[in-house]
Swiss-Prot record:
It holds the Pfam family TrmB. GO terms for molecular function: DNA binding. Gene3D superfamilies: Endonuclease Chain A, Winged helix-like DNA-binding domain superfamily/Winged helix DNA-binding domain. PANTHER family: HTH-TYPE TRANSCRIPTIONAL REGULATOR TRMBL2. This is Putative HTH-type transcriptional regulator TrmBL2. It comes from Pyrococcus furiosus (strain ATCC 43587 / DSM 3638 / JCM 8422 / Vc1). Belongs to the transcriptional regulator TrmB family.
Amino acid sequence: MSKDRMVELLQEHFELNLYEARAYVALVAFGVLTPAELASVSEVPAPRTYDVLRSLEKKGFAMTQPGKTNKYRPVHPANVLEKFIQDWQERVKEELEAKKKAKEELLELMAPLIETEVPKYGVERVWVVRGIKNSTLKTKEMLEEAQNEILLADDGFIAVNLEDDIIKAVDRGVKTKILLTKNLLPRLKASKIIDYAKEGKLELRALDKFDLPMLICDEEVFFALEDLAARYFNYETQVWIKDHRVVALFKEKFNEYWEKAEKV
């Protein structure tokens, strides 16, 4: 029913509870109601009507009509809903600014902890990362911190979704080689990666397929463990290693793929 849908929308998007939403719909339908009348035409329990109507008035959805009997009329939906959205936008804007300031303050406060040369619980050289969100954050971190070299063998995520981070690294002067599976090329047709390859700012090649996708940034390597079920549910397990010996082994594999690949 349309009434149920109206109640649902008011609850979901305009911060009214169930009884408030039902009461407001009834007010819009009937125009002016006393608490007793509201109880008879809506599904708001009689003992709750006074509190519900006062709450609607406080939230700006209803107004009291002067007289001997308490009567309430609705504020026009176009007015109250637009006002709600404007207030919400302002509130979100303020919250966003507050979060940005908090982020900057936290980064400033944590800088000494990050930059300290004292090892914390030993030198961590191996991390296991699970889930697409965490993997994306780690990949972005590696691309942002790369100074000399990026070697990327990608079969479906990084080049398409983290193009800006790759381009920024190239613009910083990081030497970059990207190896893609050929099925990705149509998705990158209009990307800066293709443009940069044509301009010689990075090297780009393609293969039909390869068994071991990887990202190497300087002395770090990041790769996924083979688990088709986990990949289906976006919960792949990936491993990050910082060890020049391990990186050398992965570079050998990357170069093996690179030699077989076609220039794009």
